Amino acid sequence: ADVPGNYPLNTYGNMYYCTILGENEFCRKVCKVHGVKYGYCFNSHCWCEYLEAKDVSVWNAAKNYCKNPVGK
């Protein structure tokens, strides 16, 4: 079964590059920052399962999930 998801984008609007395909600690951390629990390295970029379009940009994800009131 195909799981929906997205490639998250960093502060520069680029996908996160990764070198270790499949299980990837860096990608898992990236996906947590973007508000989802799991992700992995696919085609040399981090892919996050169940990542919604609204949270693809790290700026949007930070606004949606950070508890810090700065910028609100």
Swiss-Prot record:
Q: Which Pfam family, any one, appears in the UniProt record?
A: Toxin_3
Which body tissues produce this protein? Expressed by the venom gland.
List the cysteine pairs that form cystine. Answer: 18-41, 27-46, 31-48
User: InterPro entries, alphabetically?
Assistant: LCN-type_CS_alpha_beta_dom, Scorpion_toxin-like_sf, Scorpion_toxinL/defensin
Transmembrane regions: none
Q: Would you name any one GO CC term?
A: extracellular region
Where in this chain does the record put each LCN-type CS-alpha/beta domain?
Answer: 3-67
User: CDD domains annotated for this entry?
Assistant: neurotoxins_LC_scorpion
Q: Where found in the cell?
A: Secreted
Alphabetically sorted, this entry's keywords are: Disulfide bond, Ion channel impairing toxin, Neurotoxin, Secreted, Toxin, Voltage-gated sodium channel impairing toxin
One MF term from GO for this chain? toxin activity
Q: What does this protein do?
A: Binds to sodium channels (Nav) and affects the channel activation process.
What family is reported? Belongs to the long (3 C-C) scorpion toxin superfamily. Sodium channel inhibitor family. Beta subfamily.
- Please provide the record's free-text comment about the domains of this protein: Has the structural arrangement of an alpha-helix connected to antiparallel beta-sheets by disulfide bonds (CS-alpha/beta).
Name by which UniProt lists this protein = Toxin Acra II-1
Q: Which organism is it from?
A: Androctonus crassicauda
